[in-house]
């Protein structure tokens, strides 16, 4: 995995945790909705004492919840700070490993890989999915999320590559940063890699809509409006590509 694809601030535990406490209701909702969906799927597809692999620990929000729910967690990351943050949790084993290579940690009942694939070099994307497949027992489940290539959030973030735009955004919003997303995939591209890795799709969902002016300056009414637009465009085949997160429940069949 490419450590350069992770900005310094994004490698900070507190930065990651603050995403779920953002005072802006739209930004907070984008992250919290994804967190809640992942936890719901992880809980529904595992039971007490199951072995759970988490690739990309971040601030430990999933690690903590799953360990508290009686799962035995193998926490894998390339960032030692993220692993140190969860090392003291009961029933959690930490591993400083590159998940684009075989993990060799035995079979797991469930794996979680949330908002990681976009940080992986494009030529290693398939290798990460192959590695996750190899870490699951036959019949095991992978809960996977990653941004959509043409999501409105990502289109706005690409403008931050231009320093004048980034400076203006920081002046208007108080903070702004490049996302470090180097492997953005369309649903078709991702589902091709999913199939090649040997997974079948048990469930899929897309969510999270962002328009800068409404999100940043319209407060709670703006957040409600954007949620309404999200619900309206979710069924539309092309337009739903503007939604931020593509989320999957995948099964290893063999």
Describe each region flagged by the PLM.
Residues 1-114, 123-129, 184, 205-209, ...:
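Conserved N-terminal segment of class I S-adenosyl-L-methionine
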Residues 91-93, 159-163, 219-223:
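Short, hinge-like loop/turn segments at secondary-structure boundaries
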Residues 126-141:
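A short glycine-rich, Lys/Arg-flanked "PGG" loop and its adjoining helix->strand segment in the class I
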Residues 143-167:
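Conserved class I S-adenosyl-L-methionine
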Residues 165-176, 230:
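Short, flexible, basic/aromatic active-site loop/helix in glycosyltransferases
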């Amino acid at each position: 995995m490419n450590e350069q694809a992770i900005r310094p601030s994004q490698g900070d535990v507190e930065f990651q945790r603050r995403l779920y406490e953002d005072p802006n209701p739209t930004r907070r909702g984008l992250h919290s909705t994804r967190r809640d969906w992942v936890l719901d799927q992880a809980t529904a597809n595992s039971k007490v004492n199951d072995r759970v692999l988490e690739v990309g620990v971040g601030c430990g929000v999933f690690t903590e919840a799953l360990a508290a729910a009686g799962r035995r967690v193998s926490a894998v990351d390339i960032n030692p700070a993220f692993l140190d943050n969860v090392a003291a949790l009961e029933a959690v084993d930490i591993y400083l490993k590159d998940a684009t290579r075989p993990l060799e940690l035995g079979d797991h009942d469930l794996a979680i890989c949330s908002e990681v694939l976009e940080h992986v070099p494009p030529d290693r994307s398939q290798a990460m999915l192959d590695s996750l497949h190899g870490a699951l027992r036959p019949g095991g489940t992978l809960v996977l999320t990653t941004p959509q290539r043409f999501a409105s959030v990502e289109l706005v973030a690409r403008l931050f590559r231009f320093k004048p735009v980034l400076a203006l955004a920081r002046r208007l919003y108080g903070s702004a940063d490049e996302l470090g997303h180097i492997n953005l995939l369309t649903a078709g591209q991702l589902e091709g890699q999913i199939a090649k890795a040997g997974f079948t799709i048990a469930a899929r969902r897309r969510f999270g809509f962002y328009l800068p002016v409404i999100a940043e300056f319209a407060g709670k009414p703006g957040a409600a409006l954007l949620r309404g637009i999200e619900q309206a465009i979710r069924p539309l085949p092309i337009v739903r590509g503007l939604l931020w997160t593509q989320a999957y429940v995948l099964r290893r069949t063999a």
